[in-house]
Amino acid sequence: YSSAKKGEWIIGRGWINDTWDDPSFPTKEDLDAVAPDSPVYLTRACGHAAWANTKAFETAGITKDTPDPAGGEFLHKQDGSLLGVVTDQAQDPFNKAIPSYTKEQIQKIVLLAQQEFFSNGLTSVQDAGSPEEWVEAWQELYEKERLKLRIYVSMRVLGRPNYQELMEGSLKFFKKGLRIGMYDNRLTARAYKISLDGSLGARSAWMLEDYEDQPGHKGNGKWTNDQLYSVLYEARRAGFQTWCHAIGDAANRQCLDVYEQLLKELPDKDARLRSEHAQIIAPEDIERFHKLGVIPTHQTVFLRTDKNVADARLGAERIKGAYAWRTLIDQGNPLPNGTDSPVESCNPFLSMYCAVTRKDEHLKPEGGWHPQEAMTREEALRSYTNWAAYAAFEEQLKGSIEPGKLADFVVIDRDYMKCPEEEIKDICSLQTVVGGEVVYETK
């Protein structure tokens, strides 16, 4: 491919080094060996790290002496040379160097995604951060009735912006205003997304204390509390629901602290502010979610790979506040579920299987990983239906099959509530219906 497209950017996504025989981060020389003449940029599955070759570093203007930006790192070898992996805000120079998608490419991507979602039994999705040009491209498809998927959008400034870029871009969204229930309740843009840290796999999740397996490193926070408050204040003033990507316990504490301040300044008993992932929470902060009414959203399918590294990264004490689904539910929190696709497969039944069993698709570990935090089958089902709808202010429209709600449903190949639990991951859609129209059916 690199020979045929010599000199053109080659971009991709999906590598997870934790599953390799050697889980060390790869090097730029690995890519140079197969594509020396084209810039190559491959994003890790989590989206919070990327692997690039020498040509990509040159094109982006990065050398071994380039200082790390706030909230990101250009990883180096012991001799001081560039390794070939960058994290979080350090991805920004590459994002700016890579040509933007055309409208036609954006539309092709969403139509391919739509078919993948329908075939997996999904009728609605909540999009975790898209810029205005993507939403405008989708609107054109809705007007032509080619896009039938229901999308609840959180607006986001694309790339890895600095604070000034973040505020300028965000104010444009807020000025545009809310768009609710467009195209027969198929498109809503009423949320705003901001990332507070990175991922556990990339060791860029922002922690209160050092990583157990990397002393001296706490990950990367992206904003000061004042910066975060100022942009979220503008979002709330404009009526937007806010989503904060927060993986580490420091990021979740910042999220809760700033939300608490916001709710004092702009009181709202039904704000439904969200922490996206709420993955690692200091034990003393867990009860604050219910107290403040902050919704902790989760991606239970993350367990299938994170269980391989989480104990080593976090240690015996911090793991008690990680992936704490049972604890959060028992305290009265709804727990909306998802997959963060394309971070993981969009298959909801694999995610529900992980929620119920605390195991990977290979039925490991025996007995489940920290099984005391598992969900019941009914809770896992609610996490993809009622609770997810509630998290999007759409519980009056969807989330259950009853008179007056949207005719969106899926016919599956076995009884989810009664099949052996190891079969939950194998459930598949026979027919997917959106608005009373069959949009997918097995042949």
Residue ranges of each PLM-predicted region?
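Divalent metal-binding segments
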Residues: 1-171, 190, 194-251, 264, ...
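Short beta-alpha junctions and helix-cap segments that line functional grooves
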Residues: 27-28, 175-176, 339, 419
